[in-house]
Amino acid sequence: MRRSIAIPAVLATCLFFAACGEDDSDTPTGDADPKVIEVTIQDGTVTPNGERVRLEQGQDVEFLVDADKPGELHVHTDGEGQTLPYNQGVSTLDLALDEAPGQIEVETHDPDVVVVLLEIR
């Protein structure tokens, strides 16, 4: 008789602790929609210019660049960094980030400007 009482008690205890487990919904998964950043480069003027942009860890970025001549965005990550070339006119540049929390500069060298500072949280 004790065995028949012990089994339901153990099962009930397991279910109780399983229900009390942490919810992982606050953990970044990289499934967030890409952050769209519009960049305009016209007559030597760049907008945005040094603006801070917050990202979730694992969130990708999509740059929509409207430029009066071809050029490159330089992304300074912990590794070797990345170069994203753009054409004259409107270009869409996709940036996949797999970085730890911190800050990443995105700049152009013609003109020499920090376009955005990505803050990964």
Segment roles from a protein language model:
Residues 1-7:
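Bacterial N-terminal signal peptides that target proteins for export
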